[in-house]
């Protein structure tokens, strides 16, 4: 594979995708998508404060956590309600911050429409399954309550020069993180393939990966994913183009990489955030949310192995 034309194409398309996504966010179009999460919030049988914090997660997970913490400290919600809200919270985060703003455009551009859409869909399904667990628990064990939320959305879609400039500036912040990772890992993986070190990697990890029907070289995707998910996408695409991975294997290794990324995020950021907002109770929240998230991803991997 000729690396320079490939790298140029990926950088160009990634830049266009991220920029367009950032501009779309600034037009207020994303606010219309909140209607996707509202029905789920309304049937969750949670108090209005929990629903409001869930909608905050659509904007940013830190916003949602901070709002929920405030309601908890004011005794407006109890521990069980906070736990269930935390379990449901990844869904609006996935739909809002992860998928529509960054993950979807990058996955489609780098992995292609078919593989990119399937992988992003698996992430969305993961969020829905986790939310379903929380919703079922709340409806079975919580007393039925009446929830009233204003569903009228008066925000208008705006598209002008100011919106374009603002979206472009936000895209630059994202691209400053994404582009270097794509370049570094594209060159690194290409170098390893040419050097033959992939054979060494294959020998070291083939026993474990054989169980999952993965080649030993797939470990490079996991390593790249530790730096940034876009680097993981790029590595997968390179391995597919070099005949190392097929689509099924690519999806499995991407989900494994997702588990590793989630683990690192929790170790680096989430646990500290939960504890700082909720005290000792925050550690319990982090452990519960992480455990359910990983278990669902493992389930999806097993389903891929069995049926894809």
Curated annotation (Swiss-Prot):
It is found in: Cell membrane. To M.jannaschii MJ0871, MJ1556 and MJ1589. GO terms for cellular component: plasma membrane. This is Uncharacterized protein MJ0880. It comes from Methanocaldococcus jannaschii (strain ATCC 43067 / DSM 2661 / JAL-1 / JCM 10045 / NBRC 100440). It holds the Pfam family Gate. Keywords: Cell membrane, Membrane, Transmembrane, Transmembrane helix. Its main location: membrane. It is a multi-pass membrane protein. The chain crosses the membrane at residues 10-30, 91-111, 115-135, 178-198, 219-239, 251-271, 288-308. The lineage of its organism: Archaea, Methanobacteriati, Methanobacteriota, Methanomada group, Methanococci. It comes from the Archaea.
């Amino acid at each position: 594979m000729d690396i320079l034309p490939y790298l140029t194409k990926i950088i160009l398309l990634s830049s266009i995708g991220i920029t367009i996504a950032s501009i779309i966010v600034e037009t207020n179009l994303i606010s219309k998508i909140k209607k996707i999460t509202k029905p789920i919030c309304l049937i969750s049988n949670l108090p209005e404060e929990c629903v409001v914090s869930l909608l905050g997660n659509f904007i940013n997970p830190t916003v949602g956590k901070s709002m929920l913490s405030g309601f908890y400290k004011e005794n407006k919600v109890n521990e069980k309600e906070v736990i269930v809200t935390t379990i449901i919270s990844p869904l609006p985060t996935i739909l809002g911050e992860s998928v529509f703003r960054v993950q979807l455009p990058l996955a489609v551009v780098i992995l292609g429409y078919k593989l990119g859409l399937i992988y992003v869909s698996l992430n969305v399904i993961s969020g829905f399954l986790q939310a379903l667990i929380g919703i079922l628990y709340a409806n079975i064990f919580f007393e039925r309550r009446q929830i009233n939320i204003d569903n009228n959305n008066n925000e208008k879609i705006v598209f002008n020069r100011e919106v374009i400039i603002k979206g472009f500036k936000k895209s630059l912040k994202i691209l400053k993180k994404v582009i270097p990772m794509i370049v570094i890992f594209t060159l690194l993986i290409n170098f390893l393939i040419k050097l033959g070190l992939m054979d060494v990697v294959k020998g070291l990890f083939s026993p474990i990966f054989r169980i999952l029907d993965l080649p030993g070289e797939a470990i490079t995707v996991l390593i790249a994913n530790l730096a940034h998910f876009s680097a993981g996408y790029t590595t997968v695409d390179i391995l597919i183009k070099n005949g190392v991975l097929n689509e099924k294997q690519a999806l499995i290794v991407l989900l494994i990489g997702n588990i590793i990324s989630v683990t690192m995020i929790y170790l680096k950021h989430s646990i500290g955030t939960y504890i700082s907002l909720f005290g000792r109770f925050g550690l319990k929240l982090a452990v519960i949310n992480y455990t359910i998230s990983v278990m669902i991803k493992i389930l999806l991997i097993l389903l891929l192995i069995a049926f894809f």
